């Protein structure tokens, strides 16, 4: 038919405009794929044969290349296989696993179970079937147990499955007491052992177990691993070991006797041990820092929003026990723990005056003292410990004539307190002044999430402070504008929960401070505004808060490995939590 005749036969409306209809058969791609699968099984138009073991699999190059970058590169880059009619994997790939991958390529379906998940992960990674690798990872994440977590660490590290590695690591940290002398532990790489023993989240109350596990791992392959010993030894909290064991190890342990670096590390630990006993609780050295499993959880609160008492959380008895009275009741303060001490900064007293005061509670001697006052009186601020110093961030002030601020203006000013010198120093200001922000430290940096701006708006920024540069920067945007939220830290993961809107009050998110990526996690059991959170023993705890007229009366726990929340115990009805901190239980004797 000529073009002219075709043009004359085009359908036109009465106005002369084109009348066009788009036909889209939704099932077309499925029909094509199903027919290709039928032709594969009948060996019609197949142009390549894959071999695994002693089995052959006729296929279509185009289908393989469309599903796998591995095959796309193989068939298009002039490799020998692009010309040959066969690709032989020999024994590097199990025939049944290759068959599953090909069935997926031609049907978009695959059954993953406990028997094939690891093999599919390995094969999916090798042949760049990324969907299969990710699906196998997700399956293994949901089937992670103490009995297989060490093996999953090794597998996920080999195939760069970051999420599976992190979950496996957390499970190992939680069960280290039963895993440290297993064959799988001895199969870990040096870097994996370092990830475990250097973590504050390692759930072990007797540091001797960690010390012995390092010796056991090194001696399992002494010739290859003895050079790693000093690096590993430095991550053991040696000053937490009994004095007699420290002395005995220096004299009797061959690995220490034979290495000058190890001797020096042990000598430093002995000196630190002596300083601990002499300095009555002032400890800054890593070798004396207890793991978080050796921490005590303390709630600061009162019968009203005016806080007047400290309470201790008893994990085992699931009780909240009154501990000590505050010497000066206050509200809208911030509290932060450094070692065995709790620092209560600022706030407003009974007459609503804004305070510069800093009260310090010594959990060892159970007594209060005053430290040097802050440079600016403030309330509604945040505080966090960073490299054994205390930082206070943002908030409000009502001190006229010092800074052009009022209770309605959010501060940019940041102060740093050094417990060793008992002095405060002004640091670089926030990029944007905020109050009621969630402030935490992670990976040697400070983070401030959301808050209330100088215009009284909710803030959606993540502000980050780098102490090396003494500078704040904007790292990311929050999933939504936030204020009156809580934050807790597990390694490089920061967990944010709660807020003052219907949409944020029950929500919870995970922020990776190394990649600046957000992930939505399971919602809390209740809506919470002005709640308080901390991390201990690879779990996140949240307490307090309210929404509308409803007060939250439970202490809840979030388990990252199962992405689930549950209530631990009820908070006494008369207690309104104002702060939540974690301190060292004791100094090692």
Swiss-Prot record:
Q: Where is the BTB domain?
A: 46-114
Which Gene Ontology biological process is one annotated for this entry? positive regulation of fatty acid oxidation
Domain of life per record: Eukaryota
Indicate the segments forming the BACK domain, all copies: 149-250
Gene Ontology CC terms, in alphabetical order: Cul3-RING ubiquitin ligase complex
Kelch repeat extents:
296-340, 341-388, 389-444, 446-492, 493-538, 539-585
MF terms from GO for this chain are: ubiquitin-like ligase-substrate adaptor activity
The answer on whether this UniProt entry bears the keyword NAD reads no
Record pathway: Protein modification; protein ubiquitination
- A Pfam family (short name) is Kelch_KLHDC2_KLHL20_DRC7
Extract the InterPro entries matched here. Answer: BACK, BTB-kelch_protein, BTB/POZ_dom, Kelch-typ_b-propeller, Kelch_1, SKP1/BTB/POZ_sf
Coiled-coil intervals: none
- Keywords per UniProt: Kelch repeat, Repeat, Translation regulation, Ubl conjugation pathway
Role description: Substrate-specific adapter of a BCR (BTB-CUL3-RBX1) E3 ubiquitin ligase complex involved in various processes, such as translation homeostasis and lipid synthesis. The BCR(KLHL25) ubiquitin ligase complex acts by mediating ubiquitination of hypophosphorylated eif4ebp1 (4E-BP1): ubiquitination and subsequent degradation of hypophosphorylated EIF4EBP1 (4E-BP1) probably serves as a homeostatic mechanism to maintain translation and prevent eIF4E inhibition when eIF4E levels are low.
How does this protein assemble? Component of the BCR(KLHL25) E3 ubiquitin ligase complex, at least composed of cul3, klhl25 and rbx1.
What is the protein's name according to its record?
Kelch-like protein 25
Q: What's the source species for this entry?
A: Xenopus tropicalis
